[in-house]
Amino acid sequence: MCTPDENDYKTSTDPDTSANTNHTLEKKKRKKRKNTNVACVNCSRLHVSCEAKRPCLRCISKGLTATCVDAPRKKSKYLAGIPNRELPMSIQPDLPPRKIMIPIYNNSSNSSLNVNNMGEQQKFTSPQHIVHKAKFLSNAADSEYSILSNIIYQDTLSNKIPIDILYSNTNSTSNSTIGNSSNNSPMVTNTSPEETEMEKIRQLYSEQRANMPPHPYPSSNQNVYSILLGPNSAKIVASQVNLFANHFPLVPVDSADNSLNFKRLLPRDPSEKSSQINWDSSINQYYLNSETVTFPELAIPLKRRKNHLVSVSLESCSPDAANIKSNVGWEHSLRYSTPMEIYTSINAPFSHTPGFHHLLVYLKHRFNQQDLVKMCRSIAEFRPIFIACSVTLTEEDMIFMEQCYQRTLLEYVKFIAQIGTPTCIWRRNGQISYVNEEFEILCGWTREELLNKMTFIVEIMDDESVRDYFKTLSKVAYRDFRGSEKMKVCRLLSPIKGKIIHCCCMWTLKRDVSGLPLMILGNFMPILN
C-alpha cells in the first residue's frame, strides 16, 4: 500500500510525461520541408526567386527562354580547377551545357571550319575554363594557380583553354590511349552528347597538331662537320663513324672575310663591309642573331670603335614560342621533353668513363708534358673523394642518377629559355650537354655542331683557359661546397681561326644525392673593353 506522499508524487509526474509524449508525436507528424528550387542563370544573377519549371515565368516575360537553365552550383574550394569527369559521381555538380573552345592554328587547313559558331564557342562563361597555360605537374598546384589566375586575370584571353584539353595529352599516341581507357572504364557506361562533342574536338585538335610543320631541329645527318674536324673532315664524315663513341675535336677554319659564310646555307652578301653589319650609328649598337651575324664576326669592328661606347642587341624569339629541344639519340644531352618519358624510358645509366678516356687522349695531343702534369695533379686532388662517394652505388643508383640529371636538365632548359645570358651546360667529364641560342651567338658554334658529337668544353677554350678550367673544377667540385666559382677570364675559340672571345665565366655546380657533381652551368659574358 502506497503512502500519500508517494501517490501525490506519481500524480504530479503524469501530466509531464503525457506532454513529452505528445510533443514527440507532433514532431513525427510534421511534414518534411520542400526543397528550395534551383534558380536559373538569369534569376540567380539578379538574386530573385525562381520556380522549378524551365523556362520560368520571369524568363518567358523577358524573352530569355533560350538561356533559362539551372545556374551551376559552386564547387568546393579544393575541387576548383579539376575536371568534372575526374571527380567521383557523388560530388559532381549540376552544370548547364558547356561552351567548348576549339583551338585554331593559322597553318591548318581546317581553321576555317565552323566559323559561324566561333562567336558562341568563345564565350568563356563556363567555369570549365581557366585563364593560364599548364605550368604545373601537380593537379593541386595547378588548381591553386588557376584560382589565383582567375582572381587577378593577368593572362591574356588567348591563353584560356579548356581544362579537359589541358589535362589530356594532345599527341596521337596519347589520344588513342585515352580513348581506349575511356571505353574500358567501368564507371562510364553511356556516352553523353557532350562527351561525344568533346571527343570530336580532341580529334580535331590532334589533327591540327599533326598538320603543323615539324621543327627542323635536331638534324639527323652530321654533314655540318664536313669542314670543322680538321684536314680529314670529309673522310671522317664519309666513313659514317659514330661521332658519339669516338672523339674528333672541332678545328677553327681560316676565313678570308672574317665571317662564318663558309658554314652558312645562306651566306651574307660579300659586298657588304664588316663595319656596316647591322649597325645603327645613331645609338652605336649592333644587332646580332644566330643566322646572319654572330659576335665573333664583330671582332674587327669592335676594335676600331674601342674608344667609343658600343653595345649589342640580340634578336631572339619569344620564350613562349620556343619549344623544348630534345633528342632521344643524344644520350649526353636532353633526351625527353616530359618528366613521364624521363622516368619510364631511361633504364640504363650514362657512362662517364668513355668521356674521361677521350678527354685524356685529347689533352695528350694538345698539351705538353708539363701542362699535363699540372692538370693531372688537379684531377688527383678529387679522385679519392670521387671513389669514396661512388664505391657503394649500385646499377639502380646510377640509373636513378641519370634520371635526376635529365629531370634537372629539363627544368634548367625551361629556365634558361626565359633569360638572355649565354649559357652552356656540361657534365662532370667536361662533355657539353646543352647550350642556348645566346651562347651560339656569342661563340659562333651552333647547337648542332656542339651536340651532334662528343664535344668537350675545353675544345672551345684556349690553352690558358683550359689550365684554369681544371683548377676551377677541382675547387668548385670537391673542395668548396658553395657550388659556385668565377673564372675572371675565359677565352673561347670561335669557328674563325684566330678569333678569340674574351669572356667572364660564372660556374654553378649541381650535385646529385650522393654528393657527386651532377652538372655544371657556365654563364658567359663577353668583355668588350
UniProtKB/Swiss-Prot annotation:
Residues 40-68 bind DNA. GO terms for cellular component: nucleus. Its main location: nucleus. Keywords: Activator, DNA-binding, Gluconeogenesis, Metal-binding, Nucleus, Transcription, Transcription regulation, Zinc. It is found in: Nucleus. SUPFAM superfamilies: PYP-like sensor domain (PAS domain), Zn2/Cys6 DNA-binding domain. Residues 408-480 form the PAS domain. Residues 14-23 have a biased composition (Polar residues). InterPro entries: ERT1_acuK_gluconeogen_tf (IPR050335), PAS (IPR000014), PAS-like_dom_sf (IPR035965), PAS_13 (IPR056751), Zn2-C6_fun-type_DNA-bd_sf (IPR036864), Zn2Cys6_DnaBD (IPR001138). Residues 1-31 are annotated as: Disordered. GO terms for biological process: cellular response to starvation; gluconeogenesis. PROSITE patterns: PAS (PS50112), ZN2_CY6_FUNGAL_1 (PS00463), ZN2_CY6_FUNGAL_2 (PS50048). It comes from the Eukaryota. Belongs to the ERT1/acuK family. Transcription factor which regulates nonfermentable carbon utilization. Activator of gluconeogenetic genes. PANTHER family: TRANSCRIPTION ACTIVATOR OF GLUCONEOGENESIS ERT1, ZN(II)2CYS6 TRANSCRIPTION FACTOR (EUROFUNG)-RELATED. NCBIfam families: sensory_box. This is Transcription activator of gluconeogenesis. It comes from Saccharomyces cerevisiae (strain RM11-1a). The gene is ERT1.
